[in-house]
Amino acid sequence: MATTIDFSRYPLTGWYPGHMLKAGRQMQASLKLVDLVVELLDARIPGSSRNPIFDQLFRGRPTFILLNKADLASPRVSREWTASLRKEGKKVVFLDARDTRQTLELVPAWRRAALAERSKGRTALNRP
């Protein structure tokens, strides 16, 4: 189900800083503990704020894409991104993270997604 990413092919100099390499390795080592992926992007620049390695790293995991600062984004471009991300099987939510109510309303949806994974026998819930 999960694939292994060879982070050694990413140089430590140039565009891929060492702290990103280290974080990628740590995430890969912790994948068995991941039930649900929540990826936070800037709604104004979702393509630029997205890490393409995450698609491979978290393949097979339910994923929520949160597009923050939705009030500042172009509605037309937001619709296009929503369609594209949903084709990839991701749940897309636009929000203003300063609004605590919006943020708290996401928790039940995350629980439902994690429980759906549990029913498929692919969850890490109840882990030590």
Predicted stretch roles:
Residues 1-58:
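N-terminal accessory targeting/assembly segments
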Residues 6, 69-70:
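Short, solvent-exposed coil/turn linker segments
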Residues 14, 68-69:
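Short, contiguous strand/loop micro-motifs
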Residues 50-68, 74:
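P-loop/Walker A phosphate-binding loop and immediately adjacent motor/lid segment at beta-alpha junctions
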Residues 64, 70-128:
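Canonical P-loop GTPase G-domain recognition
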